[in-house]
Regions:
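Glycine-enriched, solvent-exposed interface loops adjoining structured elements
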Residues: 1-152
Length: 152
């Protein structure tokens, strides 16, 4: 991957962007685990950048692009995916401009003050992008309440 792709993928995984989320049912593979710690192996999606959640909740371990678990049923993953530029909202695209400017400022202008200026602009654009993105998605209520349940 080139430097641009690395910066874009890094920015896509820094925050749980709503436009970059996916949910997928994982495919059970025919791979037999090496030891008896896990009984099943599932394939992760090819466009996955960062895994958020595996459902149903349970004991699992990631090995490369596979999920090893003792669960043997329908397994779903919530994850951040490698979103094409054409699907980026304007607020994220603008933030990416500043991320690129920050990373390339020194080599283009040979000026540390230029890098500091772009870093400052990036920080502002990043805050605004996260705020805008968060306004588009409802808050998820906490389903598990161990401190309340222990008192019952």
């Amino acid at each position: 991957a080139n430097l641009y792709d690395n910066i874009a993928q890094n920015e896509l995984t820094k925050y749980r962007w709503g436009f970059a989320r996916k949910k997928a049912q994982l495919a059970l593979t025919t791979i037999i685990p090496v030891d008896d710690e896990y009984s099943s192996v599932y394939q992760l999606p090819s466009d996955l950048l960062a895994l958020t959640t595996i459902r149903p909740n349970g004991n699992y371990q990631l090995y490369g692009d596979k999920v090893h678990t003792n669960f043997n049923g329908a397994l779903t993953a919530d994850y951040q995916f490698n979103t094409p530029e054409s699907e980026w909202p304007a607020y994220f695209a603008k933030m990416m401009e500043y991320a690129l400017a920050k990373d390339f400022a020194t080599s283009i202008r040979d000026s540390s003050s230029s890098r500091q200026e772009m870093s400052s602009e990036y920080a502002i654009a990043s805050r605004m992008a996260r705020f805008t993105d968060s306004q588009q998605h409802p808050q998820t209520a906490i389903a598990h309440q161990p401190f309340i349940e222990v008192r019952r």
